[in-house]
Curated annotation (Swiss-Prot):
Family, per entry: Belongs to the TRAFAC class translation factor GTPase superfamily. Classic translation factor GTPase family. EF-Tu/EF-1A subfamily.
Residues engaged in binding GTP: 19-26, 81-85, 136-139
Protein name (database record): Elongation factor Tu
Reaction(s) this enzyme catalyzes, per UniProt: GTP + H2O = GDP + phosphate + H(+)
Subcellular location(s) of the protein: Cytoplasm
Stretch list, region G2: 60-64
Binding site residues for Mg(2+): 26
Keywords associated with the record: Cytoplasm, Elongation factor, GTP-binding, Hydrolase, Magnesium, Metal-binding, Nucleotide-binding, Protein biosynthesis
Spans through the membrane: none
Enzyme Commission no: 3.6.5.3
Any Gene Ontology CC annotation: cytoplasm
């Protein structure tokens, strides 16, 4: 069956369900589509369609993710749900499924569990801006005091990891009752979507952020000067604007004297465009792949940072052995590899393949970087890990 095209007239937000295994993330995802389908805002998707999530490859890592889309009165949503805990870890660290917000699912019958904690921590580390809580399976709890206790525990846990635990909306309901079409089940889903609509902030569009373009290639065009090519990551570049060349060497200033796309001259290039940018007075040898063009002052080069990293298992084509302190692989940022040294936290002697870990990295050359930047770890051209910059240290 052909997928119905959604009219993209409403603002778009990417969200996902997170939480402990068997707390009802996939049931909730199915319930949202089934309840919203009644008002024409979704295509009803059954639990087993979502649970059979296809495998995808993101930066050399295989991740199983299910995608559904739906809309409320105010917004259009793309929603991701992962079958296994490892898929969540990989998804959040690689940014394969960008999340502007999350729905944390907690079983009222069990309360917060180890993966509940881990997902909240990961969400904080990778910069998920906001989350709403769905306290699921309330049909299995008879004692209102117990519900209150679980809610309190969840709020404390959120606060502990740096989210505003006292403010976050917590909706109580039963995904199963919603799937069965019971009115109280559906009412909770509608309440949840109202909370998601109002509490999860509208993301800043890529074109509204400062201009940034990773350099992929550099050419010299006789009589015209130096042209750099790449895909604009964020913002807009107009002819005549000053820009900086950042990373690997000292930051240089230059001016954009032309923007070209598909052999046509444009007045500007914007986020998502593959363009060639002509630089005034910049020599071919002064620019190289791995640097970025950026709005002056918007991004700085750094060589020391803290990261949250997922290390590929042997089965995924990663290392067969753990690595220890002072391990020196290549870190692939945007378009280039830079060698760096890993410093593990004092309580960790090694990191096993298949684990995720937090550690500090020192690069041999600085890279244009901001918190939230994704990278791969490579050894001789093969990906052995994926990470995200959580804190810049210098």
């Amino acid at each position: 069956m052909a997928k119905a095209k959604f009219e993209r007239t409403k603002p778009h937000v990417n969200i996902g369900t997170i939480g402990h295994v068997d707390h009802g993330k996939t049931s909730l995802t199915a319930a949202i589509t089934i309840v919203l389908a009644k008002t024409g805002g979704a295509q009803a998707t059954a639990y087993d369609q979502i649970d059979a999530a296809p495998e995808e490859k993101e930066r050399g890592i295989t991740i199983s993710t299910a995608h559904v889309e739906y809309e409320t009165k105010n917004r259009h949503y793309a929603h991701v749900d992962c079958p296994g805990h490892a898929d969540y870890v990989k998804n959040m660290i690689t940014g394969a499924a960008q999340m502007d917000g999350a729905i944390l699912v907690v079983s009222a019958a069990d309360g917060p569990m180890p993966q509940t904690r881990e997902h909240i921590l990961l969400a904080k580390q990778v910069g998920v801006p906001a989350m709403v809580v769905f306290l699921n399976k309330i049909d299995m709890v008879d004692d209102p005091d117990l519900l209150e206790l679980v809610e309190m525990e969840v709020r404390e846990l959120l606060s502990k990891y740096g989210f505003p635990g006292d403010e976050i909306p917590i909706i109580k309901g039963s995904a199963l009752q919603a799937l069965e079409g019971k009115p109280e089940g559906e009412k909770a889903i509608n309440e949840l979507m109202d909370a998601v609509d109002s509490y999860i902030p509208q993301p800043v569009r890529a074109t509204d952020k400062p201009f940034l373009m990773p350099i992929e290639d550099v050419f010299s065009i006789s009589g015209r000067g130096t042209v750099v090519t790449g895909r604009v990551e964020s913002g807009i570049i107009k002819v005549g604007e000053e820009i900086e060349i950042v990373g690997l060497k000292d930051t240089q200033k230059t001016t954009c004297t032309g923007v070209e796309m598909f052999r046509k001259l444009l007045d500007e290039g914007q986020a998502g465009d593959n363009v060639g940018i002509l630089l005034r007075g910049t020599k071919r040898e002064e620019v190289e792949r791995g640097q970025v063009l950026a709005k002056p002052g918007s991004i700085k080069p750094h060589d020391k940072f803290e990261a949250e990293v997922y290390v590929l298992s042997k089965e995924e084509g990663g290392r067969h052995t753990p690595f220890t302190n002072d391990y020196r692989p290549q870190f692939y940022f945007r378009t280039t590899d830079v060698t760096g040294t890993i410093k593990l936290p004092a309580d960790k002697q090694w990191v096993m393949p298949g684990d995720n870990a937090t550690f500090t990295v020192e690069l041999i050359k600085p890279i244009a970087m901001q918190e939230g930047l994704k990278f791969s770890i490579r050894e001789g051209g093969r990906t052995v890990g994926a990470g995200v910059v959580t804190k810049i240290n210098n």
